[in-house]
């Protein structure tokens, strides 16, 4: 069974604004932060199919978010147009929007 995905646009905060210190790879399937919509539950996923080069703090990019815990986790909040926070632990490292 193939896992479901949503396409997201992510903008990382700069380190000075409380974001990451290093660039994140959105293409290799190794970056696994959480999404949170409007203060809701943390939603786990893995990012892939993003740009070949890692995305630097302060930059933005599109990638596919693989809903790795479905069906055990409900991802229904991730609908087209919804805005979200990108978290590493409790730290909000970026913002995003579901595109498809």
For each predicted feature, which ranges?
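C-terminal effector/interaction modules appended to NTPase cores
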Residues: 1-100
């Amino acid at each position: 069974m193939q896992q479901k995905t949503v396409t997201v646009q992510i903008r990382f905060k700069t380190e000075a604004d409380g974001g990451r210190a290093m660039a994140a790879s959105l293409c290799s399937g190794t970056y696994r932060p959480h999404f949170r919509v409007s203060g809701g539950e943390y939603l786990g996923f893995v990012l892939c199919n993003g740009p070949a080069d890692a995305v630097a703090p302060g930059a933005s990019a599109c990638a596919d978010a693989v809903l790795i815990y479905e069906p055990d986790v409900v991802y229904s909040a991730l609908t087209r147009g919804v805005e979200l926070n990108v978290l590493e632990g409790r730290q909000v490292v970026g913002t995003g929007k579901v595109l498809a």
